[in-house]
Amino acid sequence: MRIGLVTKGSRGDIQPFIALAIGLKNNGHQVTIVTFKNFQKLITDYDIEFCPLSMDIEKEAYTEDVLEVLRKGNMIKFARLIGKNSEKYNEKIILEIDKVSENFDFIIASGLAFPNILPITVKKNIKYGILNFSMPYSITKEFPAMGFGFQNISFINKISYSIFTYVAIKLFI
């Protein structure tokens, strides 16, 4: 079977898909990982077929404006900046995934890539699955969403999940 593994995110999001690709290849499947271009060497070093998405996530994550906002710890400004920066890539990434999807009988997507592949798989009648290795995400007042350094204040903790969700949607959808 020709399987496409579509994932977006950091190296930590990519590595589990490399392990999955190795296992699938060892069981006779033809596997291609579709992800950001800066992970090409990491993936091809394992003799896995690679299809690049044009965005270099590491380059975009370490721009001076992003680093400045992170240094100041203002997650609302960070959310706005991520939304603004990601808009220029999302349409192109969806088109790139759409083009390469013709080579797959089945697509397995990460949680961050799932919204991008869903309309493509439905349109082309390609079977798909979602595989998510991220930490659990349940809105609670007991502690803030990951990435938030707020003191443990219950109403702020709950708000942090809305901000986190907004950032995730703007960055990866």
Regions found by a protein language model. Name each.
Residues M1-C51:
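N-terminal subdomain of nucleotide-sugar transferases
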Residues N38-K41, D45, E49-I173:
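Nucleotide-sugar-dependent glycosyltransferase catalytic domains
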